[in-house]
Regions:
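Surface "functional belts" at beta-alpha junctions
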Residues: 22, 34, 89-197, 213, ...
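DPxDG-like acidic metal-binding loop motif
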Residues: 61-95
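N-terminal beta-alpha supersecondary unit
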Residues: 1-66
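Residues at secondary-structure transition points
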Residues: 30-38, 69, 73, 77, ...
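Short, hydrophobic alpha-helical segments
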Residues: 47, 206-214
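Nucleotide/phosphate-binding catalytic cleft detector across ATP-hydrolyzing
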Residues: 233-247
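Short alpha-helix plus adjacent loop in nuclease-associated cores
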Residues: 98-102, 202-208
Length: 247
């Protein structure tokens, strides 16, 4: 089975080709250009490099979120368009789950993986997993301890320490790198890994779950948090109310 996978949850994002659960190639995007401008060219360049035609793709995969609202919309719309034209189905994969799978290869059963993505506004998108020991990229390989959420780094760390006073984990993602000092200060046993290119993991996970593929129109983004524009509007309204109370 041939899979084309996209990740547009970060500024750079990535595009990958996967065949028979093997990553053929994965390429990071040019963060200086918007996803909308560069994605079509990046997809054509990658498929041409391996002499794949878009009509040869059996399954399309995309990071469903969380991440940049604009990036998510562009990535999902791109995959929907390609899948619709070629009459293929689509699998959406959580970027946090893909992060955890990408980081789990060298971890022993029982190890915990904390996927952290920078959510801006001094927050992180987080999810917590535990390695079960089943085959890599199988659904049973990771067990979700805590599903996708958004919060401040200190609040997340405090919550997990309440879960286990001796809490430690492998933290992965750009959010983990950004807040590495707080993570390591909480426990010297915590390990921080950088954000990998996710499209490859997304493609392998999608092929593993091909039986769950849906029609292109059925893919829905995983936002976790409301758009920044709405949050900024609410903050202005709250500030205006507080100001009026003081008059």
């Amino acid at each position: 089975m041939r899979v084309l996978a996209l990740d547009t949850t970060t500024r750079e994002g990535s595009v990958a080709l996967v065949e028979n659960k093997r990553i053929v190639d994965v390429r990071r995007g040019d963060g200086s250009r918007t996803h909308a401008l560069r994605l079509p060219g990046e997809i054509v360049t990658l498929t041409d490099a391996h002499r794949w035609r878009l009509s040869d793709i059996d399954l399309y995969a995309v990071a469903s979120g969380p991440g940049s609202f604009t990036g998510l919309r562009i990535g999902i719309a791109t995959i929907q368009g390609l899948a619709s034209v070629h009459r293929r189905r689509v699998v959406g994969i959580s970027a946090l789950e893909a992060l955890a799978y990408a980081a789990s290869a060298d971890l022993v059963p029982g190890a915990r993986i904390a996927a952290w993505m920078d959510a801006h506004r001094r927050d992180v998108f987080t999810a917590l997993y535990q390695v079960t020991g089943e085959g890599p990229f199988s659904r049973a390989h990771l067990s979700a301890i805590e599903d996708a959420a958004v919060s401040s780094p200190t609040a997340v760390l405090a919550r997990w320490q309440l879960l286990d006073p001796a809490f430690s984990a492998t933290f992965v993602g750009d959010g983990a790198v950004l807040y590495e000092s707080a993570i390591v200060a909480t426990s010297p046993a915590n390990v921080v890994k950088p954000l990998p290119d996710l499209a490859g993991a997304i493609g392998v996970l999608a092929e593993e779950r091909a039986s769950e593929a849906v029609a292109p129109s059925a893919i829905r983004p995983l936002y976790v948090r409301r758009p920044d524009a709405e949050l900024a509007r609410d903050e202005k309204l709250l500030a205006a109310k507080e100001s009026s109370k003081g008059m």
